[in-house]
């Protein structure tokens, strides 16, 4: 539990959410490289290798130019033309193209590698400008690779290059020079000779000989084709290298110095490019840099997939293409089949299989080649959030009042879109366009009419002119011929002309009137037309009218008008108001009312397209990353089929059409809304109708009443008439029949008259009709005239009618209906018809929309709030862009089987595991389970219970398998899977719930209680809980073992009470407790009691109530429990599984029957004994009471008998008068006794009862039998329970309960430990994979490398600070956890991690590391090499000695200048100079291992010169260990080594003389080296090498770990921009001074908090020093350092409260010489201590003179302090003490007194008092007595020696001398004590004396007459 709490302190080192991980990767910067090096060193070749592996973009001039030319871009065409024309390409253009490439999308995704910047050409840009260009790139370079190569080696290599004149391929010297090839062959041959047999050697030699011959033949063939390029000439190469060093090198060195040293990779240019590439890859792997994610096309040209394939089948097919590994298929993305490129634009297009790619382990389907190209270049913009998301192109349709506008607004707010109201934005524009069309049509018609009228008038004018000409001609002829007859034709023509003229004049006159009328008429028509256009803009007309022909005629007749222009001047002006024009356009104006577009719906679609374009342009920035198209919701769109067809044709296709409907309860909800909206209108109509009906009813009632009254009146009259007739009949019985008929006629007339008068219908019926029956239809047929007549008659009575209406309205009430319904009245029928017609139109339109593959969402509005509708719409819109879950099908199982078989073929170990586990179990173990592992996620979320899922009910979500408890749970998951999975953190596991069961007496209660206390959870005893439920009422426990005792006790008590009553005895209370009254138990309590009594299982209803409190209710639900003794029966276990109350495990405590007997039988026997004792006591009491009762009864009976006898006697005496003799009396007494014996016999039961009592042996046997039977029953029951629990997949834990209690408890804790400690990871599952597969996954970015990189997270959590290195000896073990790969260093750590991954990823991320550089020095045979090798094997560091470095250069680079110089020295028999050795060491340090893991330098440096060379080359070790071993131990080890060494054919360099020389040389030089490193770098550690190698190893590792931890912490904090401690970082004092901050060596924390100037320059230690923002600061203590590290900004400018004073304002301590040099300046305060005076509140007593040893200068004043403490106070707070004034009265001056002038006591007191006291005290303690001297003289001598030995003013030599003499004096004094103890009175032979007795006796005797001081 504690470990779990501890892990929660830290956040996850890696992002837990998979989507967030992907987003983080997409936002990350790609790794960018820059390669520096001399020209020709191999930058381009290395860049080519890196590009192939790292997939970054190589930005070089030549590939870019070739790419531009091949793509035939504008720049490419220009470049090609320049090259064809023989021109050179300007540098400016090349740089421009390179910059374009560096800023391209491709580079933004993959990163770049630059090799040609800076270039040697300075024409376009200088070197500094080129460097600034690199620094100012959007993507800054992360890694700088510097290839180093000596000038000589580089020039030789380049000058040896040759180029093939045909192919252009360049050959190096070792490829074309036969001599070089031969030399390489010989060296290789010599190297391979060692360690091989003769046969193998011969075979290899033959093969190599053949290969060599073939190679030489090839060389001979190409040799005559090789030429040397001019730039490869030696002098040209030298010039280029020289130019590089002069112009570029210095700038590059500055750049590299500024760059993070971790990301600076320096390479040895003499190595081949392949080896350099491997070194770079190792360094990148060490730095944990992520390579660019590559995209893989999932379908080749030869593979074809049908485009119409179902999505599921398509994804299964694509997931198997180019498989990473079995079980690791390409996953489905959120986009599904949607094209991400088009979706980014706002269009939802399905992708095609031919354009499918994989990226980040997921499948993406692109829709076209055009979409695929940009996605392949840079997929990041298309995948970053908010993508994928719906573009929000929605149409919402529905009847009026269905809530579509509300839903539109809410949806627009949700997606930051805009609502396009069709009625407000589209329809007005269409109406306006139609008005414009009508106006244009009328204008065209008017222009055509004007043209026609003008033509007509022109023709008339021409005719008139012709007539006038003819008339003039006639007049001329008439004048010539005075007499003649006119021709008839002329006459007729003239007459006709005149008539025509007159007619035309008449027509013109009438036309004026018509013009005015037409004008007014046309105005009215236009006005009406405009109104009608507004009115009928929604109608569709069958005919369309155009006037194109008129416009064409008008354009064709322009010439005619121009020809007749002079004539037109004579014609009146024709305008639109011309009567003839008005007459002509009247028809057009009438027809314009029905004018519309030829395709009106296309016009609607065009306008809607314009509106949507404007909306999208205005709202394009509605949220970051919003798609270009979309963001609109169309409301109130007409549901016209033709309109939708036009919209689809125009491409206005929504992503979703939402139809709001109300089909439930016949549209009750919608009609309710309509009614509430139009309530007043509908209610008024209802009231009006009800009033009419009521009035009609009132009228009908009134008419019926009148008719009834009339009938009654007629009946009364008839009755009277009949009575009258009877009277008359009586009077005139003799009247004739005629008279009777007349009377009858009169009666009939009387009847007819009232009927006729009463009838007011205005129609009289014939007599025949009166007698016949009236048909039912008649009143209806004549009802109208009746109403009319009544109305006419009632019109004059208005006031009376008004009163009646008011009364009626008071009685009319609206019909009642439910609140959520509407009144079903005729007034609602129009609305119903309207909605019905809308539904019919929608049904027609729905088919059209579906045919266009537009998604339709039918939403029921009944019983749903707008928020619920919005949520449903949002879910529908976003569901296509979410991960989908699907039920596990046969195809999934087939894939799993296929993967398993493939793995079995690859993995041989799997076969071994199969032998132990079955195939099904292996498949189950290897399955990739989901976020709840094998538990049901639905039950976990809803009930917080760990219920194992059923493998038959399985589903897959995001390529992970989930198991479910039931089909219903699976359906819930499939509907909303995202609600049941983990997101930002793992799902919270329920607390521990354990069922603890076992036979009675197994110890489960004790174990459960101890476990619960330890885990801090509840301990629940099931049967005790049941007892507690009854205990309140029963006040006693219930059960067979309790009930039997209580019944016996109750019967005994009852018997005892009865006997006590009989005996009239009061029984004691403890034996006569009252019986409890009977209690009334509830039904539930009765069931519980029955269960306890009869040992039966509880019914499910009771169990549900009890168990739900523990599983589902707080606080137990969130705390956990140990459930003791449950389940008791199989039925209860079955209830657990059926109801879903699953524990984490069921613990079965197993014991034997003998264990039960041993535990329970003693207690049972004691209980039996106690019962027997009570029983005997009770029996004795009963017996006594019965005896007492018997005695009392006998006494009563005896008294009765005696009374009877006496009575009889008295009677006999009276009768016989005789005295009774004594014999008779005795006989009578005997008779009485006999009677009593007969009546009260002795109780035989009591006599036999004692014999029937159970004996102890019998009781033991009985109890043993009962326990055995109970144990067997319990065991059988538990076995069934165990089988039942296993059936429900509940884990079973078996514990042997027969052992001791603490052992059982320990075993139980260990078994439950995984459930407790690994609780946080209970749902996590890890998958180990091979290392090659891990690298492949990282290459394809199928999985991500974790934040730990190649650190072992387990070892990191255990405090390891040295990164493990992968090699053959130390393999790594990759493990996949979620989307990350973790690398573990051993199998043990792998197992730990897999059990609890959450624990190890909840820790701080690993700190940045640097390669460890260790130097180990020491004398020969001190163990340097042993320790170095141990470090190398343990941590993978390189073991390097100076000899090894030299051999490395000579063997691997023999042609280099360094190797040649070394060979020159060695061949002459000289040692290699230190300068060359250090160069070889530097080359060796450039190895990959040295720059990743680190290096251990063994035994170097050993001289000061070597140390200086290391410093000059900046080879500074992190730590130097000196193994200190005495010389004696060295030679001892040498001898042991020689004894054990093997004999070799050559002498070893390990003779004693050589070792002695080396030892002396080492000890001579090591002191100076040690002092230098201790002072400069403080990295020197001395290890006592005299200890064992394990002790030395532990000390070394402890110090390495400490220093490495300091280094890592420093790098981590500096990288985060925080302050960091700089201790243990090898910082020199010079560097410290150069980088001191604003406060120099004063503590900034003290200055800020207390304004104290704490000078830290007194110590050279950097323990309290820190770095912040590139400056160093020193603090005064650890507390101050911690404060500075926590908030450094508060203590440095600009937030620092106090700046450091200027130099003249800082107090300075003065030495005695500096104080003397200030003469004649006097001290302030007359030499009194200012600190003492100020701290003493400036009192007189505080005036203490200062000491000149503690002088200081401040403000150009001198102050003298009393002591060092006061001096420090003044130096820290000068402002407090500097300005003070002395009082007027001062103490007298203290003048010095000569010591010799004092009297002897004073002299001794002031001079040697302290020393003398110490000497006398020592003499008193020792009591010295020198041989042959008195005690006084001995004491004086000792005091004198003591004073000399401890004289503080004496020299060191003098003190040592007298200390030695004092020791000799004390030894002589001790001789007396020794001899006194050992010498006896009797003589002893020498052999019986002590060994040293004679020697000490001689010494004693020799001291006679000898000076004890001088000898």
Curated annotation (Swiss-Prot):
<dbReference type="GO" id="GO:0005524">
    <property type="term" value="F:ATP binding"/>
</dbReference>
<dbReference type="Pfam" id="PF00406">
    <property type="entry name" value="ADK"/>
</dbReference>
<keyword id="KW-0546">Nucleotide metabolism</keyword>
<dbReference type="GO" id="GO:0005654">
    <property type="term" value="C:nucleoplasm"/>
</dbReference>
<keyword id="KW-0539">Nucleus</keyword>
<feature type="region of interest" description="NMP 1">
    <location>
        <begin position="60"/>
        <end position="89"/>
    </location>
</feature>
<feature type="compositionally biased region" description="Acidic residues">
    <location>
        <begin position="733"/>
        <end position="750"/>
    </location>
</feature>
<dbReference type="GO" id="GO:0047506">
    <property type="term" value="F:deoxyadenylate kinase activity"/>
</dbReference>
<feature type="binding site">
    <location>
        <begin position="1421"/>
        <end position="1426"/>
    </location>
    <ligand>
        <name>ATP 3</name>
    </ligand>
</feature>
<feature type="binding site">
    <location>
        <position position="1543"/>
    </location>
    <ligand>
        <name>AMP 3</name>
    </ligand>
</feature>
<feature type="region of interest" description="Disordered">
    <location>
        <begin position="728"/>
        <end position="796"/>
    </location>
</feature>
<feature type="region of interest" description="LID 2">
    <location>
        <begin position="1124"/>
        <end position="1144"/>
    </location>
</feature>
<feature type="compositionally biased region" description="Acidic residues">
    <location>
        <begin position="197"/>
        <end position="210"/>
    </location>
</feature>
<dbReference type="GO" id="GO:0036431">
    <property type="term" value="F:dCMP kinase activity"/>
</dbReference>
<keyword id="KW-0418">Kinase</keyword>
<comment type="similarity">
    <text>Belongs to the adenylate kinase family.</text>
</comment>
<dbReference type="InterPro" id="IPR027417">
    <property type="entry name" value="P-loop_NTPase"/>
</dbReference>
<feature type="region of interest" description="NMP 2">
    <location>
        <begin position="1021"/>
        <end position="1052"/>
    </location>
</feature>
<feature type="binding site">
    <location>
        <begin position="1470"/>
        <end position="1472"/>
    </location>
    <ligand>
        <name>AMP 3</name>
    </ligand>
</feature>
<feature type="binding site">
    <location>
        <begin position="1499"/>
        <end position="1502"/>
    </location>
    <ligand>
        <name>AMP 3</name>
    </ligand>
</feature>
<feature type="region of interest" description="LID 3">
    <location>
        <begin position="1536"/>
        <end position="1550"/>
    </location>
</feature>
<dbReference type="InterPro" id="IPR003593">
    <property type="entry name" value="AAA+_ATPase"/>
</dbReference>
<comment type="function">
    <text>Broad-specificity nucleoside phosphate kinase involved in cellular nucleotide homeostasis by catalyzing nucleoside-phosphate interconversions. Similar to other adenylate kinases, preferentially catalyzes the phosphorylation of the nucleoside monophosphate AMP with ATP as phosphate donor to produce ADP. In vitro, can also catalyze the phosphorylation of CMP, dAMP and dCMP and use GTP as an alternate phosphate donor.</text>
</comment>
<protein>
    <recommendedName>
        <fullName>Adenylate kinase 9</fullName>
        <ecNumber>2.7.4.4</ecNumber>
        <ecNumber>2.7.4.6</ecNumber>
    </recommendedName>
</protein>
<dbReference type="GO" id="GO:0016887">
    <property type="term" value="F:ATP hydrolysis activity"/>
</dbReference>
<dbReference type="GO" id="GO:0004550">
    <property type="term" value="F:nucleoside diphosphate kinase activity"/>
</dbReference>
<keyword id="KW-0175">Coiled coil</keyword>
<keyword id="KW-0969">Cilium</keyword>
<feature type="region of interest" description="NMP 3">
    <location>
        <begin position="1441"/>
        <end position="1472"/>
    </location>
</feature>
<dbReference type="GO" id="GO:0015630">
    <property type="term" value="C:microtubule cytoskeleton"/>
</dbReference>
<keyword id="KW-0966">Cell projection</keyword>
<feature type="binding site">
    <location>
        <begin position="87"/>
        <end position="89"/>
    </location>
    <ligand>
        <name>AMP 1</name>
    </ligand>
</feature>
<keyword id="KW-0547">Nucleotide-binding</keyword>
<feature type="binding site">
    <location>
        <begin position="1001"/>
        <end position="1006"/>
    </location>
    <ligand>
        <name>ATP 2</name>
    </ligand>
</feature>
<keyword id="KW-0963">Cytoplasm</keyword>
<dbReference type="GO" id="GO:0031965">
    <property type="term" value="C:nuclear membrane"/>
</dbReference>
<dbReference type="GO" id="GO:0005737">
    <property type="term" value="C:cytoplasm"/>
</dbReference>
<feature type="coiled-coil region">
    <location>
        <begin position="443"/>
        <end position="485"/>
    </location>
</feature>
<dbReference type="InterPro" id="IPR000850">
    <property type="entry name" value="Adenylat/UMP-CMP_kin"/>
</dbReference>
<dbReference type="GO" id="GO:0033862">
    <property type="term" value="F:UMP kinase activity"/>
</dbReference>
<feature type="region of interest" description="Adenylate kinase 2">
    <location>
        <begin position="992"/>
        <end position="1203"/>
    </location>
</feature>
<feature type="binding site">
    <location>
        <position position="1506"/>
    </location>
    <ligand>
        <name>AMP 3</name>
    </ligand>
</feature>
């Amino acid at each position: 539990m504690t470990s779990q709490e501890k892990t929660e302190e830290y956040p996850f080192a890696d992002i837990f959410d998979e989507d967030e991980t992907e987003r983080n990767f997409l936002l990350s910067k790609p790794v960018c490289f820059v390669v520096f090096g001399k020209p020709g060193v191999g930058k381009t070749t290395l860049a080519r290798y890196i590009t192939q592996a790292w997939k970054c973009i190589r930005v070089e001039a030549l590939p870019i130019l070739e790419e531009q030319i091949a793509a035939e871009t504008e720049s490419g065409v220009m470049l090609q033309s320049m090259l064809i024309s023989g021109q050179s390409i300007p540098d400016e253009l090349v740089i421009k193209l390179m910059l374009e490439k560096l800023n391209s999308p491709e580079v933004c995704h993959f990163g770049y590698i630059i090799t040609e910047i800076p270039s040697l050409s300075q024409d376009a840009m200088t070197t500094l400008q080129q460097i600034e260009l690199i620094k100012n790139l959007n993507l800054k370079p992360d890694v700088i690779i510097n290839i180093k190569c000596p000038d000589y080696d580089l020039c030789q290599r380049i000058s040896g290059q040759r180029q093939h004149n045909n192919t252009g391929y360049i050959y190096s010297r070792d490829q074309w020079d036969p001599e070089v090839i031969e030399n390489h062959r010989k060296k290789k041959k010599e190297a391979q000779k060692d360690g091989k047999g003769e046969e193998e050697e011969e075979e290899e030699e033959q093969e190599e000989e053949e290969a060599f011959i073939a190679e030489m033949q090839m060389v001979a063939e190409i040799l005559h084709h090789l030429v040397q390029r001019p730039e490869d000439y030696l002098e040209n190469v030298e010039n280029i290298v020289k130019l590089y060093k002069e112009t570029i090198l210095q700038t590059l060195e500055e750049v590299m110095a500024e760059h993070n040293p971790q990301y600076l990779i320096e390479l040895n240019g003499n190595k081949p490019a392949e080896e350099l590439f491997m070194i770079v890859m190792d360094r990148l792997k060490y730095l944990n840099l992520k390579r660019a994610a590559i995209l893989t096309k999932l379908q080749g040209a030869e593979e074809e997939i049908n485009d119409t394939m179902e999505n599921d089948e398509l994804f299964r097919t694509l997931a198997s293409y180019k498989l990473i590994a079995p079980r690791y298929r390409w996953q489905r993305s959120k986009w599904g089949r949607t094209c991400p490129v088009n979706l980014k634009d706002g269009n939802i297009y399905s992708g095609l299989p031919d354009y499918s790619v994989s990226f980040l382990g997921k499948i993406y389907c692109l829709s076209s080649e055009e979409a695929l190209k940009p996605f392949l270049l840079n997929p990041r913009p298309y995948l970053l959030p908010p993508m994928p998301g719906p573009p929000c192109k929605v149409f919402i349709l529905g009847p009026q009042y269905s809530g579509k506008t509300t839903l539109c607004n809410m949806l627009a707010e949700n997606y930051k879109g805009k609502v396009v109201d069709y009625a407000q934005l589209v329809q007005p524009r269409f109406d306006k366009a139609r008005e414009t069309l009508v106006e244009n049509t009328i204008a065209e018609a008017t222009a055509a009419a004007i043209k026609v009228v003008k033509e007509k008038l022109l023709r008339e004018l021409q005719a008139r002119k012709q007539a006038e000409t003819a008339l003039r001609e006639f007049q001329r002829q008439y004048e010539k011929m005075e007499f003649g007859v006119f021709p008839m034709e002329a006459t007729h023509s003239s007459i006709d002309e005149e008539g025509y003229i007159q007619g035309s004049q008449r027509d013109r006159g009438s036309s004026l009137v018509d013009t005015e009328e037409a004008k007014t008429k046309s105005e009215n028509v236009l006005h009406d037309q405009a109104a009608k256009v507004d009115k009928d803009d929604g109608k569709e007309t069958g005919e369309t009218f155009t006037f194109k022909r008129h416009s064409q005629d008008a354009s064709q007749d322009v010439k005619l008008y121009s020809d007749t222009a002079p004539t037109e001047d004579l014609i009146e002006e024709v305008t639109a108001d011309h009567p003839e024009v008005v007459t002509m356009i009247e028809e057009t104006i009438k027809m314009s009312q029905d004018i519309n577009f030829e395709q009106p719906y296309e016009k609607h679609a065009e306008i809607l397209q314009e509106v949507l374009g404007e909306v999208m342009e205005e709202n394009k920035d509605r949220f970051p990353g919003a798609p270009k198209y979309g963001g609109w919701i169309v409301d109130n769109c007409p549901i016209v089929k033709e309109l939708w067809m036009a919209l689809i044709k125009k491409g206005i296709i929504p992503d979703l059409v939402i139809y709001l409907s109300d089909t439930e309860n016949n549209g009750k909800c919608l009609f309710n809304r309509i009614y509430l909206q139009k309530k007043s209108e509908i209610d008024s109509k209802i009231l009006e109708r009800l009033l009419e009906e009521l009035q009609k009813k009132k009228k009908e009632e009134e008419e019926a009443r009148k008719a009834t009254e009339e009938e009654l009146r007629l009946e009364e009259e008839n009755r009277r008439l009949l009575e009258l007739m009877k009277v008359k009949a009586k009077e005139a019985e003799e009247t004739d029949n005629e008279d009777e008929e007349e009377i009858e006629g009169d009666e009939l007339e009387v009847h007819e008259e009232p009927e006729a008068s009463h009838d007011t219908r205005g129609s009289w019926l014939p007599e025949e009709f009166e007698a016949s029956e009236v048909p039912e239809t008649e009143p209806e047929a004549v009802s109208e005239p009746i109403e009319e007549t009544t109305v006419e008659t009632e019109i004059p009575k208005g006031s009376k009618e008004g009163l009646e209406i008011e009364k009626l309205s008071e009685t009319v009430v609206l019909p009642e209906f439910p609140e959520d319904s509407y009144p079903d009245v005729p007034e609602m029928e129009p609305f119903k018809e309207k909605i019905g017609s809308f539904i019919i139109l929608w049904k027609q339109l729905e088919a059209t929309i579906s045919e266009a593959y537009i998604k339709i969402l039918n939403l029921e509005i009944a019983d749903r709030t707008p928020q619920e509708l919005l949520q449903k719409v949002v879910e529908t819109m976003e569901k296509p862009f979410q991960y989908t879950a699907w039920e596990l099908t046969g195809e999934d199982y087939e894939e799993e089987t296929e993967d398993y078989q493939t793995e079995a073929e690859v993995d041989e170990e799997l076969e071994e595991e199969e032998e132990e586990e079955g195939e099904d179990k292996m498949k189950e173990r290897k399955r990739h389970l989901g976020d709840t592992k094998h538990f049901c996620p639905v039950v976990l979320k809803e009930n917080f219970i760990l219920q194992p899922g059923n493998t038959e009910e399985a589903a897959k979500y995001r390529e992970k398998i989930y198991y479910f408890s039931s089909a219903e749970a699976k359906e819930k998951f499939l509907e909303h899977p995202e609600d049941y999975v983990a997101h930002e953190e793992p799902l919270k596991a329920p607390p521990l719930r354990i069922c603890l069961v076992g036979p009675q007496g197994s110890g489960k209660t004790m174990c459960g209680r101890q476990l619960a206390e330890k885990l801090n959870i509840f301990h629940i005893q099931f049967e005790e809980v049941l007892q507690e439920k009854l205990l309140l009422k029963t006040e006693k426990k219930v059960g067979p073992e309790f009930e039997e005792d209580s019944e016996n006790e109750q019967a005994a008590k009852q018997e005892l009470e009865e006997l006590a009553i009989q005996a009239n005895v009061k029984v004691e209370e403890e034996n006569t407790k009252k019986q409890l009254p009977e209690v009334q138990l509830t039904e539930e309590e009765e069931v519980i009691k029955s269960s306890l009594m009869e040992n039966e299982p509880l019914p499910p209803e009771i169990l549900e109530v009890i168990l739900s409190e523990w599983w589902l209710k707080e606080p137990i639900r969130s705390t956990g429990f140990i459930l003791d003794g449950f389940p008791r029966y199989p039925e209860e276990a079955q209830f657990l599984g059926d109801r879903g109350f699953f524990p984490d495990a069921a613990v079965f405590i197993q014991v034997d029957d003998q264990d039960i007997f041993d535990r329970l039988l003693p207690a049972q026997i004691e209980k039996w004994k106690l019962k027997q004792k009570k029983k005997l006591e009770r029996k004795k009491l009963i017996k006594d009471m019965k005896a007492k009762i018997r005695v009392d009864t006998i006494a009563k009976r005896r008294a009765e008998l005696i009374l009877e006898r006496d009575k009889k006697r008295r009677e006999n005496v009276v009768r016989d008068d005789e005295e009774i003799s004594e014999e008779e009396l005795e006989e009578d007494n005997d008779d009485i006794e006999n009677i009593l014996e007969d009546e009260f016999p002795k109780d035989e039961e009591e006599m036999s009862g004692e014999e029937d009592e159970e004996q102890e042996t019998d009781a033991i046997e009985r109890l043993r039998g009962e326990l055995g039977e109970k144990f067997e029953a319990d065991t059988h029951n538990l076995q069934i329970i165990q089988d039942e629990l296993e059936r429900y997949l509940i884990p079973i834990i078996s514990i042997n309960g027969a052992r001791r209690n603490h052992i059982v408890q320990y075993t139980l804790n260990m078994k439950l430990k995984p459930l407790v400690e690994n609780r946080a990871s209970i749902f996590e599952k890890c998958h180990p994979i091979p290392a090659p597969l891990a690298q492949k996954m990282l290459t394809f970015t199928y999985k991500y490398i974790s934040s730990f990189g190649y650190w072992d997270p387990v070892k990191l959590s255990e405090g390891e600070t040295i990164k493990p290195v992968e090699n053959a000896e130390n393999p790594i073990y990759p493990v996949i956890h979620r989307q990350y790969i973790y690398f573990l260093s051993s199998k043990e750590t792998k197992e730990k991690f897999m059990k609890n991954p959450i624990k190890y990823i909840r820790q701080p991320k690993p700190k940045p590391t640097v390669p460890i550089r260790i130097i180990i020095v020491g004398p020969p045979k001190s163990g340097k090499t042993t320790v170095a090798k141990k470090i190398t094997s343990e941590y993978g560091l390189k073991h390097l000695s100076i000899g090894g470095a030299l051999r490395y250069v000579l063997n691997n680079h023999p042609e280099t200048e360094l190797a040649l110089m070394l060979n020159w020295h060695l061949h002459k028999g000289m040692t290699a100079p230190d300068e060359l050795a250090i160069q070889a060491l530097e080359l060796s340090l450039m190895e990959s291992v040295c720059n990743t893991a680190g290096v251990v330098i063994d035994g170097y440096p050993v001289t000061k010169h070597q140390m200086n060379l290391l410093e000059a080359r900046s080879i500074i070790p992190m730590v130097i260990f000196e193994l200190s071993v005495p010389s004696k131990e060295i030679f001892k080890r040498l001898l042991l080594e020689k004894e054990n060494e093997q004999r070799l054919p050559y002498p070893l360099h390990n003779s004693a003389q050589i070792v002695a020389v080396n030892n002396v040389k080492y000890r001579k030089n090591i002191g100076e080296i040690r002092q230098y490193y201790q002072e400069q770098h403080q990295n020197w550690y001395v290890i006592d090498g005299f200890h064992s190698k394990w002790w030395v190893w532990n000390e070394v590792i402890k110090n390495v770990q400490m220093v490495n931890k300091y280094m890592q912490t420093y790098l981590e904090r500096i990288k985060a921009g925080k302050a960091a401690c700089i201790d243990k970082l090898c910082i020199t004092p010079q560097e410290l001074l150069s980088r001191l901050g604003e406060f120099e060596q004063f503590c900034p924390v003290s200055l800020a908090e207390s304004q104290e100037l704490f000078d830290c320059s007194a110590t050279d230690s950097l323990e309290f020093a820190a770095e912040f923002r590139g400056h160093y600061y020193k603090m005064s203590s650890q507390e101050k350092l911690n404060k500075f590290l926590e908030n450094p900004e508060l203590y440095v400018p600009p937030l620092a409260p106090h700046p450091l004073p200027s130099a003249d304002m800082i107090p300075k301590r003065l030495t005695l010489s500096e104080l003397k040099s200030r003469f004649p300046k006097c001290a302030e305060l007359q030499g009194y201590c200012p600190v003492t005076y100020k701290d003493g509140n400036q009192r007189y007593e505080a005036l203490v003179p200062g000491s000149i040893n503690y002088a200081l200068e401040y403000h150009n004043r001198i102050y003298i302090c009393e002591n060092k403490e006061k001096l420090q106070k003044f130096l820290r707070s000068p402002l407090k003490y500097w300005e003070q004034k002395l009082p007027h009265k001062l103490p007298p001056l203290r003048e010095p007194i000569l010591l010799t002038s004092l009297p002897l006591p004073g002299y001794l007191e002031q001079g040697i008092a302290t020393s003398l006291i110490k000497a006398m005290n020592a003499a008193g303690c020792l009591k010295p007595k020198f041989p042959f001297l008195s005690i006084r003289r001995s004491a004086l001598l000792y005091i004198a020696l003591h004073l000399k030995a401890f004289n503080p003013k004496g020299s060191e030599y003098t003190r040592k001398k007298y200390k030695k003499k004092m020791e000799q004096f004390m030894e002589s004094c001790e001789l007396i004590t020794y001899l006194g103890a050992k010498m006896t009175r009797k003589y002893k032979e020498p052999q019986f004396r002590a060994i040293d007795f004679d020697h000490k006796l001689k010494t004693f005797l020799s001291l006679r007459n000898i000076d004890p001081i001088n000898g």
